[in-house]
Amino acid sequence: MLKIGVVLFTLLVLFPLATLQLDADQPVERYAENKQDLNPNERMKMIMSALGQRRCCISPACHEECYCC
């Protein structure tokens, strides 16, 4: 009887809990999907700002996001 109870508890309670998707996982997945939709210029801008690097700009168009070449 005890073995049947353990098997039923495992199948009816523990197995469904292990297969549920956590709510904390979903925003990360959505965030990654949103990043794939960016155009290459926006993606490069985000990567460069994260690395703390700036691009080289041609002299009349210099601004804070890049340095003059």
Swiss-Prot record:
Pro-peptide region(s): 25-53
One GO MF annotation is:
toxin activity
Tissue and organ distribution: Expressed by the venom duct.
Pfam families per UniProt: Conotoxin (PF02950)
Keywords linked to the UniProt accession: Cleavage on pair of basic residues, Disulfide bond, Secreted, Signal, Toxin
Q: Is Secreted among this UniProt entry's keywords?
A: yes
**InterPro entries, sorted:** Conotoxin
Task: Report which superkingdom the organism of origin falls in.
Answer: Eukaryota
Report the record's disulfide bonds.
56-68, 57-66, 62-69
Q: According to its UniProt record, where is this protein located?
A: Secreted
Cleavable signal peptide: 1-24
Identify the GO cellular component terms for this protein. extracellular region
Report the principal subcellular site.
secreted
Query: What protein family is recorded?
Result: Belongs to the conotoxin M superfamily.
Q: What is known of its domains?
A: The cysteine framework is III (CC-C-C-CC). Classified in the M-1 branch, since 1 residue stands between the fourth and the fifth cysteine residues.
This chain belongs to the protein called: Conotoxin Lt3.3
Q: Which organism is it from?
A: Conus litteratus
